[in-house]
């Protein structure tokens, strides 16, 4: 269970950049959903029942199912507050998972269909997302968001962010289109095409997108890059008090959706006999897709861990991940009642497990001697977030601003 001790802050409160990043993983979004509900509850203990995660993070980033969670946490709902509380996330998956991923009978006809079209038609998911997010565009979010996708026409990642949407009208897409796109995992859900228009110039841009997990299943570094770009251009709306190279002032929470890396998924002997069909479908899994996404997540974690360790800022990077999944829990689409309950249970057990961190030499996760549980680390993280927010609000009030519940990242708050 990957993590890192949250220790003494490297910077004074009110001088940090706070980031939440959530991996992709289909129905396994129940795992980070459980952890986020715990974190928000700790923030509510500190700052009152109206506290929401969007009040504390300068940026929330998510890929695939993590992008959907990002939208839930950052999209505006009633009275300008977030559409979802963190405690509502799992209810969304439990209520809608079986209809997003309907469990079909196996057989020759189903096997042949899987070779010629996506396993799911995506209509229920698309309709649910459109109803939930309506006409909200990415620049409308209550705090900055970063959601990776991949453009199959251009063969390159397309990153949607609140940062870009404010200055690039053609990137100011409907949040619903972005969420549908980042969730379009190859072989599981259909690719998504849409257009945006710049009303001032009449220019139109077309996007042909699939799941961002093929490029950045763990969006931590993508989000840090987006923030660093804003720092470099000295954006007046997002005047962060750091230098582009100063990762020591970032406070990062990165949540995985689980993996099988400690269990040993495949062997070279097995793979050496596979052709196209087996790489695309094997015992209910899509090995080539799973491998790409697992590699993306783990490499980003190792990169981030090395970066923070080199700056003696280990305590500013908290990664929580479970590498022991097996069976249905390891799939992205096993939306049975039993498996969904099991995934919630995995999230709850992760909270109780000891903090661990990646060994940058082996890529394996090891417990940190003398550290507490992941729940203890999140309590410490919540205290730092609360102190950061209070310092910003105090500074904002001192310079004539105001307003509880406003997003982070505004110059006056610094």
Swiss-Prot record:
Pfam families registered for this protein in UniProt: Patatin
Coiled-coil boundaries: none
InterPro entries in UniProt: Acyl_Trfase/lysoPLipase (IPR016035), PNPLA_dom (IPR002641)
UniProt entry keywords in alphabetical sequence: Hydrolase, Lipid degradation, Lipid metabolism, Plant defense
Sequence motif GXSXG, residues: 62-66
Residue ranges annotated as motif GXGXXG: 24-29
Record-level Gene Ontology MF annotations: monoacylglycerol lipase activity; phospholipase activity
Recorded superkingdom: Eukaryota
Disulphides: none
GO biological process terms, semicolon-separated: defense response; lipid catabolic process
Domain PNPLA: 20-224
Motif segment (DGA/G): 211-213
Family: Belongs to the patatin family.
Comment on protein domains: The nitrogen atoms of the two glycine residues in the GGXR motif define the oxyanion hole, and stabilize the oxyanion that forms during the nucleophilic attack by the catalytic serine during substrate cleavage.
Biological function: Possesses non-specific lipolytic acyl hydrolase (LAH) activity. Hydrolyzes phospholipids as well as galactolipids. May play a role in disease resistance.
PANTHER family: PATATIN-LIKE PROTEIN 1 (PTHR32176:SF5), XYLOSE ISOMERASE (PTHR32176)
Protein name: Patatin-like protein 1
Gene that produces this protein: PLP1
């Amino acid at each position: 269970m990957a993590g890192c001790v949250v220790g003494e802050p490297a910077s004074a409160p009110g001088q940090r950049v706070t980031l939440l990043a959530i991996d992709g993983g289909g129905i396994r979004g129940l795992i980070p959903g459980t952890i986020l509900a715990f974190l928000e509850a700790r923030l509510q203990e500190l700052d009152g029942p109206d506290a929401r995660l969007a009040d504390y993070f300068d940026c929330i980033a998510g890929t695939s199912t993590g992008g959907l969670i990002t939208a839930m946490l950052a999209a505006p709902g009633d009275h300008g507050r977030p559409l979802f509380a963190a405690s509502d996330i799992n209810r969304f998956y439990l209520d809608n998972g079986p209809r997003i991923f309907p469990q079909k009978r196996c057989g020759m006809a189903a096997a042949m269909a899987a070779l010629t079209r996506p396993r799911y038609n995506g209509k229920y998911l698309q309709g649910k997302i459109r109803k939930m997010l309506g006409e909200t565009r990415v620049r409308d979010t209550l705090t900055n968001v970063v959601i990776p996708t991949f453009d199959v026409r251009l063969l390159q990642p397309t990153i949607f962010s609140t940062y870009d949407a404010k200055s690039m009208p053609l990137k100011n897409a409907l949040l619903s289109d972005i969420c549908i796109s980042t969730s379009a995992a190859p072989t599981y859900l259909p690719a998504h095409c849409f257009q945006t228009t710049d009303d001032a110039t009449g220019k139109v841009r077309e996007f042909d997108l699939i799941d961002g997990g093929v490029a950045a299943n763990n969006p931590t570094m993508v989000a840090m890059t987006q923030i660093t770009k804003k720092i470099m251009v000295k954006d007046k709306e997002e005047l962060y008090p750091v230098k582009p190279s100063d990762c020591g002032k970032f406070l990062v929470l990165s949540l995985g959706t689980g993996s099988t890396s400690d269990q040993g998924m495949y062997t070279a002997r097995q793979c050496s006999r596979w052709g196209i069909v087996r790489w695309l479908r094997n015992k209910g899994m899509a090995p080539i897709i799973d491998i790409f996404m697992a590699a993306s997540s783990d490499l980003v974690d190792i990169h981030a861990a090395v970066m923070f360790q080199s700056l003696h800022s280990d305590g500013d990077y908290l990664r929580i991940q479970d590498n022991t999944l097996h069976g249905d829990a390891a799939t992205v689409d096993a939306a049975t009642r039993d498996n969904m309950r099991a995934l919630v249970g995995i999230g709850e057990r992760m909270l109780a497990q000891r903090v661990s961190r990646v060994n940058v030499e082996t890529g394996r996760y090891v417990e940190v001697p003398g550290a507490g549980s992941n729940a203890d680390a999140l309590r410490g993280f919540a205290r730092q977030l609360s102190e950061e927010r209070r310092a910003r609000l105090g500074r904002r009030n001192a310079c004539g601003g105001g307003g509880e519940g406003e997003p982070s990242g505004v110059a006056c708050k610094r």
